[in-house]
Amino acid sequence: MFEMIAEATEISDILEAAKVAPLLAPGLPASEYLSGELWECSHQADLLFAQRKRFLAEIGFCLLTAEVIDALATLLAGKEVLEAGSGSGWLAARLGERGINILAADWTDYRTADRSSKRGYPIREVFRLDYHGNAVDLLPGDYDTVLLVWPNYETQFAGNVACAMRSGQTLIYEGESEGGCTADQEFFQYLRNSFNPSLSETVELDKNHRRFPGVDDKWWVGTKR
């Protein structure tokens, strides 16, 4: 299973591979992407893995399809949205183009990030960053919805975001399930104890989701009690 990249040497390796790999474009229809095991069984597996490294460096961990972006835009229409830990800001930029009022917040500006540091992800492009700092400091605020995509593994960030939200705010989470390589156990326990899941919205986002090989990420939507 792919784990979050934390070691500086691994970040450097990904950035090197990303320089020569062809681009895997995000935002295409779901039918354009191989997914999961199909990817691993492809005769172009080596090329696809190299493309994934470039994708990590330029976009992030989540393979966003056109259908998922459409579903998010529909779900978020007319809402005030905070993306907590926006990374490259690619998703926030696309949603902003769709008229969504979204604020992209991240404590790392990857345009100026120290690559010798073990903090953060191997991202080298930033499409949108509205707030450079800890997104938790912006909560609860006047936001209707908080978007949390691939929060850092085995850190308290995801849990802190969920705890800082107020009753009635909606969380849209994308990442692996409990025991996977996003967030920590306390975050998932807090979701169970403090949020009401929204099954229909979760299914709508997940039905056209595509995954990288070895990754079991998915969408989850819930409202804080």
Residues of each region from the PLM?
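Conserved SAM-binding motif I beta-strand of class I
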Residues: N101-W107
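A short SAM/SAH-binding and catalytic strip from SAM-dependent methyltransferases
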Residues: Y143-Q156
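Conserved class I S-adenosyl-L-methionine
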Residues: G78-G87
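C-terminal substrate-binding/active-site "lid" region of AdoMet-derived donor-dependent transferases
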Residues: E154-R225
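S-adenosyl-L-methionine
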Residues: M1-L76, T108-T145
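Glycine-rich SAM-binding Motif I of class I
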Residues: G89-A93
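Gly/Ala-rich phosphate-binding loop of Rossmann-like dinucleotide-binding domains
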Residues: G96
